[in-house]
Swiss-Prot record:
Subcellular location per the Swiss-Prot or TrEMBL entry: Endoplasmic reticulum; Sarcoplasmic reticulum; Golgi apparatus
EC number: 1.14.11.7
Signal peptide: 1-21
Role played: Prolyl 3-hydroxylase that catalyzes the post-translational formation of 3-hydroxyproline on collagens. Contributes to proline 3-hydroxylation of collagen COL4A1 and COL1A1 in tendons, the eye sclera and in the eye lens capsule. Has high activity with the type IV collagen COL4A1, and lower activity with COL1A1. Catalyzes hydroxylation of the first Pro in Gly-Pro-Hyp sequences where Hyp is 4-hydroxyproline. Has no activity on substrates that lack 4-hydroxyproline in the third position.
Origin species: Rattus norvegicus (Rat)
Listed name of the protein: Prolyl 3-hydroxylase 2
Positions that bind Fe cation: H575, D577, H647
Catalytic reactions on record: L-prolyl-[collagen] + 2-oxoglutarate + O2 = trans-3-hydroxy-L-prolyl-[collagen] + succinate + CO2
The keyword Methyltransferase belongs to this UniProt entry's keyword annotation: no
Enzyme kind, highest EC tier: oxidoreductase
Glycosylated residues (UniProt): N444, N455, N544
Length: 703
């Protein structure tokens, strides 16, 4: 690591944390209170609750799921409190001079590590390693999936009020879940409830901010000030929590930690930079509402923008000036607020020097640290060779749209634009020439619709890609090779609890065929028809470069009996294949965990003896359907994989729907590994077959 980067790292580590509202992180910070008995790991309680639900033990399901949620909250609280406690008790010492200059610093690091381990083990009632969970479980809790099971279990127990509360909590983080929305309406109608529903996982800083905006718009400025100030205290507290949680274990993408050949400082840098980037992006996390991908634009600065005028309206000009100057720390060139500053200064008594009024103290240290983090990350990216693009966390499109944007007495020219993105954005552009209408290559294939007829971009619908006999053969082999949850990280019902998902890859099919567990001819058909589909897509869209397989998957989804009444959820929610669809912002974010390297997609259907299961395209709002396609044997829909083609699958309400799903890439670096292995298996099989024909053995000679 370069000298300047190492020095910056030390400076950042030694920079005192911004002061918070509430308890301070001083030397006298009290130790977290010990737990009564060992804390049970929330992932085990969650698994037990789900198992109880599916076995019909609804009381047990409620008991374990509620315990899992309590354990999850308590674990988060313990980690945060221990981080605060150890930061106060074991401050990092600055390096000295001369031989062993770095030893005081690393000694302090080791002491803090020991403090953290001891604190967590004592409060958890055992080693912290017991509470490390899989990405799937972490994702379920982030998406509030336990509340989905809870609302169903509470309904079975005739506890309507608790079911309604759990359903609302789940829906707030999953606003696209139509079934849950309908459940809530049904619960309200049955219980005749008029009071607002409670979100059990509501973020206090967002709730207070929303309340502040509501009072501000009603010209109740005293109440608005109360809630905005409360929102800021809660924001800074939540920022501290977020940063503490970033200090947990990190993933090392380029190497396994124990097998690393990197030096001491490379290992330190790798881990610390991941922690630092996580902490730096807490501002995005705190500005993002549950279930949304994009943050509220200009979120933190808007608190001070609202406050500066609210304080002006109640006659507190010094505080108005402090808040206006705080806002300028984010947007120093905002002419409206610069004018406000001049206006507020003109209202001060003669005894007050305007130059002595500085920006809010609660923000100064926060912004200083944020800027230092940005400089360090940029420096490290250049010196250590990793890529990082600094987001514009405080983006603003002109402020708020209201008559109170500028105080009376200050010139107002032109209309203001609301700070939040409300308008519908145009679909994202594809970074290559768009063409279609190339040859279909094979006889008997029937062209059905093109992009224009399907009301979109880069779309095509074809029939007779498979014959009836091939469909039957593929359906038959599917029953012999498919495994529940295959391709979905073992999840039986990854998208909806009302259907069972089974899948298999080409390589698995060939392996089963080679072992004689399914007919080799049928396994080979799976391989051959996927290659046929690839050639058709490459030819029809007139691509100038080779189209490679990114992932090939045979999948069947089966409607579960007894769970189809009043269904209005989707078998597969609306999404895009290479970006994260954000319907509220009308955006599709091309960033992990999306498969950003995918360029084209295709679905080849094998049957139509089921109900529901229509494939649908929508606008980027994930609601407006632009095309609906009924699957049948031999039908293939293909389209470009980006945000220009949001799509999903309607609920399968009876029977089993089977298809071959194919994703393609134009980048050879992202070729499907199993496909390359399958190519090698096919080459061996072809060679063996050729050898048999070449020898031309007379069966009588074998006697």
């Amino acid at each position: 690591m370069r000298e300047s980067t190492w020095v910056s790292l030390l400076l950042l580590l030694l920079l005192p944390a911004p002061q918070r509202g509430g308890p301070q992180d001083g030397r006298g910070s009290p130790e977290p209170e010990p737990e009564r008995g060992p804390l049970q790991p929330f992932d085990l309680l969650y698994a037990s609750g789900v198992a109880a639900y599916y076995s019909g033990d609804y009381e047990g399901a409620v008991r374990d799921l509620e315990a899992a949620l309590r354990s999850h909250r308590r674990l988060r609280d313990i980690r945060t409190r221990c981080a605060r406690h150890c930061a106060a008790r074991r401050p990092l010492a600055p390096p000295g001079a001369g031989p062993g200059a770095e030893l005081p610093f690393f000694r302090a690091v080791l002491e803090r590590a020991r403090c953290s381990r001891s604190c967590q083990s004592q409060r958890l009632g055992g080693p912290a390693s017991r509470h490390r969970v899989s990405e799937d479980v972490r994702s379920d809790f982030q998406r509030r999936v336990p509340y989905n099971y809870l609302q169903r279990a509470y309904i079975k127990l005739n506890q309507l009020d608790k079911a309604m509360e759990a359903a609302h909590t789940f829906f707030m983080a999953n606003p696209e879940h139509m079934e849950m929305q309908q459940n809530i309406e049904d619960y309200k109608a049955t219980a005749r409830v008029e009071a607002p529903l409670v979100d059990r996982e509501a973020k206090p800083h967002l709730e207070s901010y929303n309340a502040g905006v509501k009072h501000y718009e009603a010209d109740d400025f005293e109440a608005a000030i109360k809630y905005f100030e409360q929102a800021l205290r809660e924001y800074f507290n939540e920022d501290m929590v977020c940063r503490a949680l970033c200090e947990g274990p990190q993933r090392f993408e380029e190497y396994e930690y124990l097998g690393s050949k990197g030096s001491l400082y490379e290992a330190i840098a790798d881990h610390y930079m991941q922690v630092l980037v996580c902490q730096h992006e807490c501002v995005r996390e705190l500005a993002t509402r549950p279930g949304r991908l994009s943050p509220i634009e200009n979120f933190l600065p808007l608190h001070y923008d609202y406050l500066q005028f609210a304080y002006y309206r109640v006659g507190e000009y010094v505080k108005a000036l402090e808040c206006a100057k705080a806002y300028l720390m984010f947007h120093p060139d905002d002419q409206d607020v610069l004018d406000n500053v001049d206006f507020y200064e003109s209202l001060l008594d003669d005894s007050t020097d305007p130059a002595s009024i500085e920006a809010r103290e609660d923000l100064t240290a926060f912004v200083k640290r944020h800027k230092l983090e940005a400089e360090l990350i940029k420096s490290a990216a250049e010196g250590l060779g990793f890529s990082y693009s600094e987001p514009n966390y405080w983006i603003s499109y002109g402020g708020r749209q209201d008559e109170n944007r500028v105080p009376s007495g200050v010139n107002m020219d032109g209309a203001e634009v609301h700070g939040l993105s409300m308008g519908k954005k145009s679909p994202p552009k594809i970074g290559r020439d768009l063409r279609e209408g190339g040859p279909l290559l094979y006889e008997n294939i029937t062209f059905v619709y093109n992009s224009e007829q399907l009301n979109g971009t880069q779309r095509v619908l074809l029939d007779n890609v498979l014959s009836e006999e091939q469909c039957r053969e593929l359906h038959s082999v599917a029953s012999g090779i498919m495994l529940v949850g295959d391709g979905y990280r073992g999840k039986t019902s990854p998208h909806t609890p009302n259907e069972k998902f089974e899948g298999a890859t080409v390589l698995k099919a060939l392996k089963f065929g080679y072992e004689g567990r399914v007919p080799l001819k049928s396994a080979r058909l799976f391989y051959d028809i996927s290659e046929k589909a690839r050639k058709i897509v490459e030819s029809y869209f007139m691509l100038n470069s080779t189209l490679y397989f990114s992932y090939t998957h045979m999948v069947c989804r089966t409607a579960l009996s007894g769970q189809q009444d009043r269904r209005n959820d989707l078998s597969h929610p609306i999404h895009a294949d290479n970006c994260l669809l954000d319907p509220e912002a009308n955006e599709c974010w091309k960033e992990p965990p999306a498969y950003t390297f995918r360029d084209y997609s295709a679905l080849l259907y094998m049957n139509d003896d089921f109900e529901g299961g229509e494939f649908i395209f929508t606008e980027m709002d994930a609601k407006t359907v632009t095309a609906s396609i009924k699957p049948k044997c031999g039908r293939m829909i293909s389209f470009s994989s980006g945000g220009e083609n949001p799509h999903g699958v309607k609920a399968v309400t009876r029977g089993q729907r089977c298809a071959v799903a194919l994703w393609f890439t134009l980048d050879p670096l992202y070729r499907e590994l199993e496909r390359i292995q399958a190519d090698e298996v096919i080459a061996i099989l072809d060679q063996e077959q050729h050898g048999k024909h070449g020898l031309n053995i007379n069966p009588k000679d074998e006697l």
